[in-house]
A protein has these predicted regions:
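Nucleic-acid modification enzymes, centered on SAM-dependent nucleic-acid methyltransferases
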Residues: 1-171
Length: 171
């Protein structure tokens, strides 16, 4: 996703008129492959990812059989880059001594999870990545959208934007 920097400074425009998307470039693919290699060579992070099977239930196997889409374990809902990013956050949070700090950071992380899985699509109406809980089911999107876990100048559901919201709430 990109924005027009000139328009951004004017603040008198419709964001959807200057917002756009570029095609995937080789550097994007290379970055993804690098993250995948890093994930695969970081076994210490794997303990922060649930290894359990997704249980069969009314919403997972009857109404919208998630298993028909290749999802068997909770970890299947994330790509390797997401697993690397999210488990790295958990790994660092886990090392903190201050319990209050840990809990605030975990609060930010859990909110960040809502928009950082392969179960997320793009909402054309809202002009942003959708939310995992947009429906009362796990309904895999036809075209998953990967958000930026860490944060960017624009974006919703990033760790940075959620953390800033928590800080404002605490202050």
């Amino acid at each position: 996703e990109y924005h027009c920097a000139t328009c951004d400074s004017q603040h008198n425009y419709n964001k959807s008129e200057v917002k756009g998307y570029r095609s995937v470039k080789k550097e994007d693919v290379d970055l993804f492959k690098k993250a995948k290699r890093q994930w695969e060579s970081s076994p210490e992070l794997h303990e922060y990812v649930p290894s359990e099977d997704i249980p069969e239930g009314h919403m997972t196997s009857v109404r919208n059989p998630i298993f028909d889409h290749g999802y068997e374990k909770w970890a299947d809902m994330f790509n390797k880059r997401q697993l690397l990013s999210l488990s790295s956050l958990l790994y660092e949070i886990d090392k903190l001594d201050n319990q209050n700090s840990k809990e605030f950071l975990l609060l930010a992380l859990t909110d960040c999870l809502r928009r950082n899985t392969m179960m997320i699509g793009y909402s054309q109406v809202a002009n942003q990545v959708s939310d995992l809980f947009r429906t009362n089911a796990f309904d895999p999107p036809t075209r998953p959208t990967e958000s930026n876990v860490w944060g960017a100048e624009y974006g919703t559901g990033t760790f940075k934007s959620t953390w800033e919201m928590i800080i404002r709430g605490v202050e």
